[in-house]
């Protein structure tokens, strides 16, 4: 969808044009994005929150067994399966409270968070490394430093570049879990996980990590070092690959008056566009089925059972649904009767919760075209967890630009909270999005879909940041599992809370799920 401007933007100079060309961003794209600052983004029109029986499947034990069998059959066929892990996230936010403690005027832990960190420090998977670094830098081990009241020395050794540098590393490279044979990072846990549900009949496990350029070499080195032992232990062969967000997905920043934000040297300021930029990386992957899960949502081996079961359940739901859609598409090509097309329309409503406002009146060529459009597109099965706390991003039935209603994963920023009815829909949501997706990326003829064409560009959002002490507006691209997959066939499946164990703060590593 092209956003037209009311007034032409004559705000770029020759230096800007060279900068845009270097990043691979067209002037047209730049002007469209600058226009977004003026126009903003519309809220989505909601039909309601999804729930069990209304957009969210809750398979019975018998159905679950069928889905698990379907996935087992599929992965033993001639299909390429890839595990895709967004892993560029820095760990700095994990240590926000410890950075604050290091800068505090007091020297001994005072807050509950600080006390919890030090009281449990000997349980941390990184304890042995930290202890060795303390001995190297301070000539004392952790117990001796704590006995001396040198709490900050321990924290600075953990976070600083002379020590473990955990304050600057990405989460994927930190030691999360202890085992008798040593500690494991999330990268390693994802490799092991891949062997348990994404191994093809040839024994190959394809794992792709998206990383930031400055950490890529560290990821590659750790993967090269660790993969052989996990391959041997799980009778697998790994194909591990990496990619970075493309410079062409960076977005311009704006001043308060919506003019381009310029740096001190006069150049335009661009910022990473958020996880929605990864739709380009996903589009570069040649695979039939792709599993997507965030880097920090991992558990030790003793708790992997639920994760593995429900990943396979999601995949089974997906491949069974896809097989049915493919059969219908072939039927449409051969020539389907009006009655058969009405059955397909009913299938879209019953199985995919995809409704056309004029569905009852669609017939003939119009119905054929509608079915072809809705059946022949990327598909995804998304795990949804029952809300236990405050509602966050979650599953909804929302209106699309063509007037149809379909399942969408929405963030609170996409919903008009000033509208009491919409706010109530958000607050009544029974489930949240844990980022647990299984995606089908090829059509019924075996061709890859071009994923960027299924993005809804009107689902980005504007956030407020600062640079060099100056306020700026930042443009966030449609989120990877939000607007970037807006025009996909989407089904939601209930999964248990036990499959969702993210690490948001360092103290989360002391929770039972990470021991």
Where are these regions (language model features)?
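Primarily single-stranded nucleic-acid-binding OB-fold modules
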Residues: 353-380, 389-393, 404-410, 416-515
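N-terminal regions that are enriched for targeting/export leaders
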Residues: 2-52
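Non-catalytic interaction surface on structured domains
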Residues: 2-4, 72-73, 499-501
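Domain-scale recognition of functional cores that engage charged ligands
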Residues: 17-24, 35, 49-388, 397-409, ...
